Amino acid sequence: MEESVASEGLEFKWGKKKGVGGKKKDVQFYESFTYDGDEYRLYDCVLVGNASEPDSTEPFIGMIIKIWEHANKHIPKKVKLLWFFKPSEIAPYLEGVPNVLANEVFLASGEGLGLANTNQLEAIGGKCSVLCISKDKRNPQPSDEKFNSADFVFCRAFDVGSCKVVDTIDDKIAGVDVKFIFNRACSEKEATAVQNIEADVNGKSDSLKPNGPLARGASGSVRKIEDSAFESSDCKENSNGCKEEKEKGHYQLAIKKSTLAEERSNKDSGSRGNHYNGKDQESEVKKQLTKQKSMPGEERYSNSFEASGSRTIHSISKKAQENDVKKQLTKQKSMPAGERYSQESSGLDDRPLKKQKLDGSVTVRDGWDTTILQNITSDGKKDTGSFKRPRDKVTIEEVPPEKRSFVKNRDLVVSVSEGKTTKTVTEKGISKKPSFGRAEDKMSADDNERNYQVTEVCRRPDAGKSKWFRSLPWEESMREAEKKGTVVLLQNLDPTYTSDEVEDIVYSALNQQCEARMIERTSVTIPHIGEALVIFKTREVAERVIRRLDEGCLLLSSGRPLVASFAKITPPGKPSLFSGHIKLHKTQTRREMRDAVATSHSSQPNNLEFDMAMEWCLHQARHEQASESVSKRQLEEMKSLRINFKLKLP
């Protein structure tokens, strides 16, 4: 059974399952997978970008010898690669090695660093063909056509333990039988010519180099290569099997590999435009494939990276244009309102507006009169009338509205009316990028250029419908929503709003269903500012609403902006029985008495108090001895004075 998943915006799909491993049987092995439109199987040769040198055009070459996924989604999908060495990577050890071809590589063998290691699946950048031209009797000899079309060839191995080039290849390398490393037998089923041509056009079987890791570094995501995070009897990997260049905390790039047809879009767009049917298209593709295969390997690589480099320059120029547009929008925001409207009105007067086909007004139950304020022709065509600023109008109904989509530099006025009361909300620049959904990504250019919109707020479609099941109490709903992260706190509301009106404003202005509850005012709250708690269905919707209100500005009728943030609810604690007193529970007292450790109330030699007491006693003894010696000396001096003293009579 195949399993489809999404990996960073690229198409990914598992292929045939192979077996289950791990101590807990939580590791699933696979024989193949499809990544970014290319199918990868066991023992296919792939290219892996070198993140330590982003500008380098020399990726690493490896053979897939194991594919697996852990049941824990936090652990990424893994592949084990058996490495090939290019002559430039082992140049110091090639002295005395004869007849080294230009596109020759050396198979890693032996035991030690550089044999094989575990990588993330997203580090693979593309497929390549590595052909074995060894005269070993175990190796099926390739044809001249395969030899000419191969990207790389190998006939010798490099022993990573002794760092020597050997001519013999072992029966098993990194636990893989050598028959899977040699060329496939001719008796195996091969794809037809048309299938091979289609695979070549789609960039599956003959795509030489990925366009991502070397020419489009900005589109790739950097992945640090680590050994297997889990060890089991079936999936234990040799964590020391890494290249010397890759072992020291290196990175590899998971890239978006473009197809071969995209590489040659600038070159062959004219010729391919006339071949869409039948044999003409097939013959044209065959010519292009034969021409490409006849080129040397180095030239094909250089052409591939030149094409990808041109796309990089084009993307850089496109980003520069976007930066210029952002600067102009920032400059326009800093201008006074009157001057900005005066400059915009000249360009807006001649611009046609997209209108919705709607007749008159729609009356909703419970006395809500909902009117969509738009000028609509009977045949549904666009009205090319001039756009007039709302400030020049007496009533709101005369302002031409548009679709409910939020674009930068656009004012949205929402009127909530029930009976005779009317409340207005204005939204400016809700979003810098209309990328919150696929529908919003497909907005037309007219939607991106409109600067003002007025719409009448109506009740939600399901506001008056009866419900079969009773809803949960508000407290339970709040607790469940807080666990999911879908509770949003709206501030700066009008305190006179009701919960239903807040829900209607969110539905009309932000086009989202929610459940709202106004927070009751107390003696410590500000009487002029209201707050409401809003529960959305999912966390993504809540984040989208907060992002819109944060990047843009939703103004109320009083001119105050509406502020939204995630709410953290703290339930009130249990009040004490006596105000100002803390009561100790009997259970806590009993627990403390039970867990108390018997201790002595006097000083013991094993504590700090004993040492301090001994030091104090020493100082006290010294003081007493000094005082006693001073007293004795004083008495002796007094006795001597009395003896020598003679009373003088008058």
From Swiss-Prot:
Cellular component, GO, one term: protein-containing complex
Keywords of this entry: Chromatin regulator, RNA-binding, Transcription, Transcription regulation
Domain RRM: 486-569
Bias-annotated ranges (Basic and acidic residues): 259-270, 277-287, 348-358, 438-448
Biased amino acid composition, Polar residues: 302-315
Domain BAH: 38-169
Gene3D superfamilies membership: 2.30.30.490, 3.30.70.330
Biological process (GO), any one: transposable element silencing by heterochromatin formation
Oligomeric and partner information: Component of the ASI1-AIPP1-EDM2 (AAE) RNA regulatory complex composed of at least AIPP1/EDM3, ASI1 and EDM2 and may contain CPL2, AIPP2 and AIPP3/BDT1. Binds directly to AIPP1/EDM3 and AIPP2.
Protein name (record): Protein ANTI-SILENCING 1
Protein species of origin: Arabidopsis thaliana (Mouse-ear cress)
Gene name of the encoded protein: ASI1
